[in-house]
């Protein structure tokens, strides 16, 4: 679609096999939906379109998780960005994040759906304490864990030169936001994903 781009990141949970099945199934379901339907939507329909994509993926993962004992209880996070013109539309569930890099600075566009984020929101702990909290990986929303899902939507303006970063907690647990901004600024566009992954792995990341 002219002037349109989109991206998706899913991070599975429920054991090595279940997590892989959940994230793959969610990704494939949304890929088919975008390929089939993206060209048909009008301006202003982006939110509803993306919500349907998440609903379809949630249903696919949930039906598999409840019908196959080998992957019982599996689920996956999801964060999706759809850029059309000067607007980026973001939908997410879980703690995979979207960031906007603009003019050398980085801004988190999503709010983690996690127990620890709820503690931060209520003022019980600080963001610095959250980064070290032993339960920081307990999420409160994910694809496939219940029959219905209410993902979160937001949007922001973008201009030429901006970058949208979609990533899992495998990156954000290892690399602080300030360093993410610096790495994006210093890396060529097509080199950036590899640079970020290498940095996370060197920091002890497992994803």
Language model regions located:
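PP2C/PPM-type serine/threonine phosphatase catalytic domain
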Residues: 1-207
């Amino acid at each position: 679609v002219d002037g349109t781009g989109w991206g998706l990141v899913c991070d599975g949970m429920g054991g090595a096999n279940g997590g892989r099945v959940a994230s793959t199934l969610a990704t494939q379901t949304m890929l088919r939906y975008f390929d089939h339907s993206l060209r048909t939507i009008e301006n202003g329909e982006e939110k509803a379109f993306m919500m349907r994509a998440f609903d379809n993926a949630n249903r696919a993962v949930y039906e598999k998780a409840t019908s196959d004992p080998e992957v019982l209880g599996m689920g996956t996070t999801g964060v999706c960005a759809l850029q059309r013109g000067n607007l980026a539309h973001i939908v997410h569930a879980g703690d995979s994040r979207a960031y906007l890099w603009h003019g050398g600075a980085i801004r988190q566009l999503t709010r983690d759906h996690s127990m620890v984020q709820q503690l931060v929101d209520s003022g019980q702990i600080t963001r610095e304490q959250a980064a070290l909290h032993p339960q920081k990986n307990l999420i409160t929303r994910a694809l496939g864990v219940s029959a219905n899902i209410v993902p979160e939507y937001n949007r922001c303006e973008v201009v030429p030169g901006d970058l949208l970063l979609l990533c899992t907690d495998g990156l954000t647990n290892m690399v602080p936001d300030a360093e993410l901004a610096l790495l994006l600024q210093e890396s060529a566009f097509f080199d950036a994903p590899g640079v970020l992954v290498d940095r996370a792995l060197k920091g002890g990341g497992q994803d």
